[in-house]
Amino acid sequence: IGITGTNGKTTTSILIHNMLNTLGKKTAYIGTNGFYIGKFIKELPNTTPEIIDIYELLIEAKKEGCEYVCLEASSHGLDQNRLKGLKFDFAVFTNLTHEHLGYHKTMENYAKAKQKLFNMLRNNKYAIINNDDNYKDYFIVKGNNNITYSFTKGDYYIKEYNITLSHSTFSVIHNNENYTFSTKMLGKHNIYNSLVSIIILNKIGYTFEEINKVLNTVE
């Protein structure tokens, strides 16, 4: 599971890691916060380490019996081919804002670097794209199984939401059906992050009821 975007990579990756582990699917995480398999194992020098280091971490995850790996794919890492040779079941685009332009120079270059992740999908696997972002078209790659998410219009979209001091509740429309979810994570940005986790777990095979139960408990 590869996740790219200016904001939301870490939160979304760790959320999916925590949810899958809670559901009994042993899952690793590689990213800004380090290397985890259910719990913290070690720090990493970069959000997306060098390719040889990534392969070592993947071998370790496999030895530990992991079924999934959540990986943060940074624009620097993608541009420098640190993920070369990897294939993904899920590629996620969260958003693109004006950062890292000292390195990429233009927003177009920045988007094209992140786009590389979407050319690394296995056949018939899933590209999950924020339909509310101005740069979404870079990530809707022909031949991919493209899924959009949104607060307005998409394959999965938020119809209503309510944020209190203790939790957020929101309803998701998918295939004209309405599903309600609740999370301890606060803020509209975390509803976006939660929606990505809902889509991925749904595509893995969990029901919306099963997903809501675990989303309610993890942070």
Predicted regions and their residues:
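Adenine nucleotide phosphate-binding catalytic loops in nucleotide-utilizing enzymes
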Residues: 104-111, 115, 144-219
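Phosphate-binding loop of NTP-binding sites
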Residues: 1-131, 135-144, 174-177, 195-204
